[in-house]
Structures are given as structure tokens and as C-alpha cells.
Amino acid sequence: MSHNCAYVRQHYQVPAEVGRRVIAYGKSGIILADRGHYIGVVLDDDPKKRISNYHPTHEMQYGEMAETLPLKE
């Protein structure tokens, strides 16, 4: 998907968008991908910076927009 989480924002009524900080299952990260019904998140503690799918309302807390996006090392 390439609509920057528009479906997720509308359907689930959450502020999901690429670049927003989140806490997923107690771990902090950043949304980096629109995955249709899911959001693609890179967790801060993942050294390989892999994008993982998360449901937008299950164990998810939304924060502010990130100032920088993580890069793969």
C-alpha cells in the first residue's frame, strides 16, 4: 500500500502514519510502512531494522512524529 496508512486511520480511528513513534507490545519503535490492515513497525532495539507487521489497535500506543527515521546498519 502507498497511501500512508489512510485505511488504518479511517477504519480503526487511530493516528497511524509513516514516521510516527509507537509502543508495540511494550517496545518502542517507528511506523515505516503501510501494510493494508496492518502497520509496519521497526522496533528501536532491532539491530537489523526489520519491518514487522502489527495490528493497529492491539497492544499499540501512538506517540509523536519521529524527527529521524532509522536506517539499516
List PLM regions with ranges:
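Short, structured beta-strand/loop micro-motifs enriched in basic residues and often containing a Trp
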Residues: 1-8
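Intrinsically disordered, low-complexity linker and terminal regions at domain boundaries
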Residues: 66-71
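Basic/aromatic-rich interaction segments and small domains that mediate binding to polyanionic partners
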Residues: 7, 14, 21-61
